């Protein structure tokens, strides 16, 4: 979009900061009674009563977290919201409001920012959250997006990472590894395009993988499902950095160990096929790929009958004594130490 010479471009400088804010937020609607004042004043006003407030923030930077050569701006806006909402759902909460702050260089016209906010608005409508504020400023290079999500939950229903107990079952929603493989496909096609710009990629066999990378969904449905099943998790976390990294967070904060069974890890057929094509071990992709935004949680073993067989959930292991360590039980029955090899936000990737 940014390179389309035939498309009309409106400089952001023509609108100014407040003109831009008014322009990109005028179609956003308020859905929650707790939103007393959204965009348009010095601060948003929220009304809180019997619930506790959940707050989470994520920062996305061009060249570090996303590549606009294959990430459409509308998808970027959607994803920026979703990754924050996922954290609220991982606390067993309900997301209600977001703020969005952006820093953009002068290479982005108004039309590009409209695309970005179209994705943000779609996410707000899909997950029923209100945009209540944020900030805009200039950037010397690229685009930066910071989203803060605000949610709520009754005190007794909030689920932390530190509540896992010995013998608890380890459960994960959905399937793992697709987002990482979607990224590998997109990066491969980017390199092919550099060599031959006329080449049109055939991505029909990778639609699920690419969608999981470019337009992930937060599992708002899982806390609802668990409540319907009368299951209260003892600990929970969303899978942003990879299964191994996340279970290690739970075990560290809960002061327990774990056993994950390789043959129980849920994998989509496209993941298995793509792993064979790329000559990558599918288990390592699930353990270390990240960006799945599924929910990983523990439940008392007494809830086994409630959880087993549910098409949205997989029991992949159990919690052990801390002295037993953190282990992966392979299909051959061998026990291997789990290691965190997922995304490190502070690692220099260059």
What is the meaning of each model-derived region?
Residues 1-72, 100, 348-350:
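Extreme N-terminal cap/leader segments of soluble proteins
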Residues 2-19, 23-29, 107-130, 140-145, ...:
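Glycine-/charge-enriched secondary-structure boundary and capping motifs
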Residues 33-37, 215, 285-288:
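Short Gly/Pro-enriched turn/cap motifs at secondary-structure boundaries
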Residues 37, 69-85, 107-118:
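Glycine-rich anion/phosphate-binding loops
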Residues 45, 84, 92, 131, ...:
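Residue-level signal for inorganic ion chemistry
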Residues 47, 60, 96-189, 318:
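Glycine-rich anion-binding loops of enzyme active sites
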Residues 182-199, 203:
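Short, compositionally biased
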Residues 200-249:
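Polyanion-binding loop/helix "lid" in catalytic or ligand-binding cores
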């Amino acid at each position: 979009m940014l390179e389309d010479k035939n498309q009309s471009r409106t400089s952001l400088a023509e609108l100014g900061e407040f003109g831009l804010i008014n322009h990109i937020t005028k179609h956003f609607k308020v859905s929650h009674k707790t939103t007393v004042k959204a965009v348009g004043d010095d601060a948003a006003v929220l009304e809180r009563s019997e619930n506790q407030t959940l707050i989470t923030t994520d920062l996305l930077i061009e060249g570090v977290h996303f590549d606009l050569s294959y990430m459409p701006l509308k998808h970027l806006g959607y994803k920026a919201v979703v990754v924050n909402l996922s954290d609220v759902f991982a606390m067993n909460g309900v997301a209600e409001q977001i703020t969005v702050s952006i820093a953009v260089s002068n290479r982005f016209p108004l039309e590009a920012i409209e695309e970005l906010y179209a994705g943000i608005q779609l996410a707000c409508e899909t997950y029923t959250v209100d945009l209540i504020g944020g900030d805009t400023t200039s950037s010397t290079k690229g685009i930066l997006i910071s989203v803060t999500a605000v949610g709520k939950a009754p005190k007794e229903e909030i689920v932390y990472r530190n509540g896992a107990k010995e013998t608890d079952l380890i459960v994960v929603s959905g399937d793992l590894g697709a987002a990482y493989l979607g990224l590998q496909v997109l990066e491969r096609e980017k390199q092919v395009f550099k060599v031959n710009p006329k080449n049109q990629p055939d991505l029909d066999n990778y639609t699920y993988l690419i969608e999981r990378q470019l337009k992930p969904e937060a599992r708002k449905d899982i806390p609802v499902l668990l409540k319907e099943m009368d299951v209260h998790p003892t600990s929970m976390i969303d899978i942003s950095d990879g299964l191994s990294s996340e279970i290690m967070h739970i075990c560290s904060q809960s002061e327990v160990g774990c056993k994950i069974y390789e043959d129980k890890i849920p994998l989509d057929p496209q993941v298995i096929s793509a792993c064979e094509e790329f000559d990558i071990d599918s288990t390592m992709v699930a353990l270390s790929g990240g960006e799945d935004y599924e929910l990983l949680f523990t439940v008392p073993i007494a809830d086994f009958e409630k959880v087993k067989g549910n098409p949205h959930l997989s029991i992949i292991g159990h919690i052990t004594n801390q002295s037993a360590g953190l282990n992966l039980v392979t299909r051959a029955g061998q026990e291997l130490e789990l290691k965190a090899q997922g995304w490190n936000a502070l690692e220099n990737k260059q």
